[in-house]
């Protein structure tokens, strides 16, 4: 079995997320998605985020047929522990995260960078909603 892993916030699930997750699953037989806890999202993106709490985000992802498992992480160290225990064959990252070699390169056999489809963005969706 070929294991694939991705991580992210996945706050307001949109087509860009879905395209990337579908692509990730096509790289193997089993897809693990690691998502930031609410505390971590607030730390990274501000007090008004996330829009959807971690349990709702986890539920949304688990409803997708191409996602097999979802784990929460609260720090980079916790993400590394997930990677160490899961030992992904493939780690899929957005191509906007190509800078240098990082954690994904250390704990997976292969890293594949995924180019975004369109200009989908949770931040843009929030801005469009609040500007109406």
Language-model regions, residue ranges each:
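Nucleotidyltransferase catalytic core that binds NTPs
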Residues: 1-132
